[in-house]
């Protein structure tokens, strides 16, 4: 992923969406008028910022209760968004990566406070604090002291296709002294590992590489076998190649006031943000996250492990839009209430997940448009409605 999910394009969207259509599948709450009310609410919110396509889902007690698609997956062909449309979910990928790492903890392959360096095939240490090891917990919580300063300067993406550079080679180019992009000043902060929050894509790339080495096979294959298959996530893919064209949500950005498609891109740090998934699939995944690790009759994490992921901390440097950082999951205010959450953003996509652990419920929202301040507000409005005291489709 090249852009942080916190980045916002200030250009206001002027694209007028005509004939926004809602398509529905899966389980729904309540009577038809209630469903129509939710449809009308979401369509109104979309029109505020001219979002071409959106998918939303609600999970409760380990079940995806409500999933629905709105608008267009592809504007030119007027192909509608369905609940099986596969969106690039960007940094929501990190929640899946974190979940797989926690499975390795449960399997006793690693411990959270183990140093990661012994599991690597290259040396890893912050040169300013060489005696302080970087641990799995540090990476999961964005307190590893690994900096993204150089990461954002060098574009490793490949347009229209999956990246060919292996993730290990990519990481060494940034983290191994003497390699292409590695300088001690740019690739590591002056802070000691474990002390200061700084969002790190490189840290999550490292987690994907570590999980592959420790788990005995590519982490992507581990997630297919241990997470996606048990949860029946049939429309989720780590690659562009494995995302059927008929199911792809075309990403869009505004250029000179006109909606323009953005080419799909592949990048070598796949564990950071390469996942494509449908709202039906991902709502099933977050159903498990909100329900103590269990959904669809399958357990992907023990309840104590899932609860541990949602324990929030406030390290130095935590930005004011967050109220806490957990293991993969973050926390922020939604309508004045602190909720576990994560956002994802890349050119042409903006995604979000919010959770209410007390009610074992969660909301998912995917869009195929670059983020703006206005679309951020829309996503929050929809998530708030989904997690509110009334269920989707009511009021």
Predicted regions and their residues:
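Catalytic-site signature segments of enzymes, centered on catalytic residues
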Residues: 69, 84, 131-134, 150-245, ...
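Active/ligand-binding-proximal structured segments within catalytic/core domains
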Residues: 97
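N-terminal secretory signal peptides
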Residues: 1-14, 18-23
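A short, polar/charged loop-to-alpha-helix boundary motif
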Residues: 74-81, 374-380
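Solvent-exposed loop/turn segments at secondary-structure junctions
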Residues: 146-147, 204, 369-372
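Active-site helix/loop module of the DD-peptidase/beta-lactamase fold
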Residues: 37, 53, 83, 88-92, ...
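Catalytic loop of the DD-peptidase/beta-lactamase superfamily, centered on the K-T-G motif
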Residues: 28-69, 151, 157-160, 195, ...
């Amino acid at each position: 992923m090249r852009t942080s999910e916190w980045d916002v394009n200030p250009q206001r969207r002027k694209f007028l969406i005509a004939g926004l259509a809602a398509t529905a599948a899966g389980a729904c709450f309540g009577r038809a008028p209630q469903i129509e009310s939710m449809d009308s609410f979401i369509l109104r919110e979309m029109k505020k910022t001219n979002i071409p396509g959106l998918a939303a889902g609600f999970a409760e007690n380990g079940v995806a209760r409500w999933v629905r698609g709105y608008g267009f997956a592809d504007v030119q062909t007027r192909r509608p968004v369905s609940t099986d449309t596969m969106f690039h979910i960007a940094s929501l990928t990190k929640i899946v990566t974190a979940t797989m790492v926690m499975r390795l903890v449960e399997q006793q392959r690693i411990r959270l406070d183990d140093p990661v360096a012994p599991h690597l095939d290259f040396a890893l240490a912050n040169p300013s604090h060489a005696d302080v090891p970087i641990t799995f917990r540090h990476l999961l919580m964005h307190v590893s002291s690994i900096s993204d300063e150089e990461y954002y300067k060098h574009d490793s993406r490949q347009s229209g296709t999956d990246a060919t550079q292996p993730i290990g080679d990519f990481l060494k180019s940034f983290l191994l002294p003497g390699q292409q992009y590695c300088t001690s000043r740019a690739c590591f902060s002056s802070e000691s590992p474990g002390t200061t929050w700084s969002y790190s894509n490189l840290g999550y790339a490292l987690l994907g590489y570590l999980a592959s080495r420790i788990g005995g096979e590519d982490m992507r294959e581990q997630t297919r076998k241990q997470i996606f298959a048990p949860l029946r996530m049939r429309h989720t893919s780590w690659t562009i190649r494995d995302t059927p064209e008929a199911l792809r949500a075309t990403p869009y950005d505004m250029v000179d006031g006109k909606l323009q498609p953005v080419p799909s891109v592949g990048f070598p740090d796949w564990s950071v943000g390469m996942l494509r998934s449908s709202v039906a699939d991902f709502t099933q995944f977050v159903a498990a996250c909100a329900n103590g690790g269990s959904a669809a009759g399958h357990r992907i994490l023990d309840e104590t492990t899932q609860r541990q992921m949602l324990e929030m901390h406030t390290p130095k440097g935590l930005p004011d839009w967050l109220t806490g950082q957990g293991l993969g999951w973050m926390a922020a205010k939604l309508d004045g209430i602190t909720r576990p959450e994560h956002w994802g953003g890349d050119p042409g996509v903006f995604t979000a997940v919010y959770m209410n652990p007390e009610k074992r419920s969660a909301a998912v929202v995917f869009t195929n448009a670059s983020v703006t301040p206005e679309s951020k507000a829309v996503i929050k409005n929809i998530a708030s409605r989904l997690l509110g005291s009334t269920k989707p489709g009511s009021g």
